[in-house]
Every structure is written in structure tokens, then in C-alpha cells.
Amino acid sequence: MIHPETELRFINETVGYGVVAKTFIPRGTVVWVQDDLDRAFTPHEVDLLDTPVREYLEKYSFTNNKGEKVLCWDHAKFVNHSFTSNCMSTAYDFEIAIRDIHPGEQLTDDYGYLNIAEPFVPEDEGTVRKVVYPDDVLKYHVLWDESIRENLNNFKSVSQPLLKFIKAAQLHAFEQVCSGQAELRSVKSCYYDTRVTYFGH
């Protein structure tokens, strides 16, 4: 579930639609939670889909660390990529804002932690990185983990409308991290190794 103070807007001809903040969203805010309405398709289920449906799923889903394609039920599926993203995935099935997001600003993810199937070249943002690779999370997880750590105090101090949708065990584990009682699980654990077979899938 995407943050309630967001909406879908047409951005431009290159990226199409995107998710934009309607109000100020401070850093540390949970901006997305994987909830029970999101659908996770196993590799076998994906193989059974008709080609047009499978192509839609490939475009609008992300891959979790089990190799499942997760299709968000709301406009979260339209969040665009940025090499300087203002949102960051965590290993606790939710994302947080790692910078303040202002009204009219897009919410963006770095697709490098979403287990994309093939490298792709997005719009040039003037950054050193120009290509998103399937294994980027293995290269940049230390940097990305630090961006989460920098917002642990903010997580506890800002309004959190999505908190009630986080699974109790995941929320408890993250709160343990915020209070210094546990180590942060690395976003590296979100990586799907295509060489591993998950039995039952």
C-alpha cells in the first residue's frame, strides 16, 4: 500500500506516469508497505500466464528474494526509477522516505534493489551510474543500508499512517533496530539469486 497522501500523475512522454506527493512527506516516513492485497506470483504461476498478461506483470511488478513477482494492487506499481531516489526499500517489507519529499515531487525508487531481470538505461540524471543492473544491490547495499540508518530517529518521530499495515513481526523487528536492541537487516537480503531454486515454487 502506497502512502495515502500521494496520487498518480502523468510525468512526461519518456517515463509516462509516476507517483507524486500531494502533501509534505518528511524523511523517515513509511511510504509503502507490502500488504495482503498485493499479489505474489511464483515462477510457476508466471509461466502459466498468457503472454500479454505476463508482459504486463513483468513491467509493473518487482521480484522478491524468493523469485516471486509482486504486483502492487494500487498506484505503487507506477513509482519510477531514480539513481538519486528519495525512497528506500528495507528488508522488512516496507519502504521509507530517506529525504523530505515535497508536494508535487515524485516518489522514486532505485530499481537496483528490485531484482530487475535485465539491465536497462533510464533517463540520464547526470549521475555517475548510467545503467541499472540486476545485481546492483550486491554492490551498493552498504550505502543503501546507511541511508536507512540515518533515518531511524525520524521513523519514530514523524506521523506514520501506514504503520498499522506493517506485519506485527516485521514492525517489532524494525522497532528493535530503532531502539538499538538489534542490528539492521541489510537490504542485501532482498536480493534474488537466480542460481538458487526455491522448492515449492
Where are these regions (language model features)?
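Conserved catalytic SET/PR domain of SAM-dependent protein methyltransferases, capturing the structural core
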Residues: 1-201
